[in-house]
Each structure stands twice: as structure tokens, then as C-alpha cells.
Amino acid sequence: MTREQDLGRRGEEIAAQHLIGRGYTLVERNWRCREGEIDLVMTHAGTTVLVEVKTRAGLGYGHPLEAVTRAKASRLRVLAGLWCQAHPDRRGPVRIDVVGVLWPRGGQPSVEVVRSAC
């Protein structure tokens, strides 16, 4: 596993714990299909929440949330539709949240959540 992959994995764990601490329930991690991957599938207040997590160790490449471009947001919407097709038993509202984790080396991670980001 590369340093970037390890940072991403740890960022997903930080994001999951942050959301669980705010009343979300974890349903699934790293759901994959031929079109891509959804980092976290959670529920919150009767809504299925599909979560994209972006983690950075610094701001050299911009804030983690800046990594979700229009193209990425469009792809997340496609993935959301595919997830819903694959889980017809999950009825009700669905939204896509984006979580940015900024975790400087030697520092504490900071977490920012954008609800209904896409």
C-alpha cells in the first residue's frame, strides 16, 4: 500500500467515526461496481447517505473538498443511481455528502462535511 493509499484509508476511517459520532450509521465501506466506488454508505435520520471522502496531508494541492470537481460530482451521481439499482430494498431518500479530511503530518486531522454536495 502506498503512502497516499494509506492516508486515504485512514481518512475514510476518521470520516466514518466523525459521522458515527453525529448519529450516522455505517452500512457499507468501499462499495464497488464497474463504474467506480462509493467510499462510505451510511444512514442518517431515515436517509441513505453516500459519502465521498477526500483526504490530504497538506494544502499544496488545495483543500480536500476542492478535489471534487464537476466531473467527479457527475460520476458520484451516476454511482448513486447504480447503488440504488443494486439495492432495491433500500427505499427512501438518498443524498451524497462529501467529507474533506485535512491531516497534516504530525498534526491532528480536521474534518469538514458538505451535506447534499452533489
Curated annotation (Swiss-Prot):
MF GO annotations: nucleic acid binding
Pfam families noted in UniProt: UPF0102
Gene3D superfamilies in UniProt: 3.40.1350.10
Taxonomy, superkingdom: Bacteria
Signal peptide: none
NCBIfam families documented for this protein: PRK12497.1-3, PRK12497.3-3
Matching HAMAP family: UPF0102
PANTHER family listed in its UniProt record: UPF0102 PROTEIN YRAN
Family indicated by similarity: Belongs to the UPF0102 family.
Protein name: UPF0102 protein CMM_1377
Phylogenetic placement of the source organism: Bacteria, Bacillati, Actinomycetota, Actinomycetes, Micrococcales
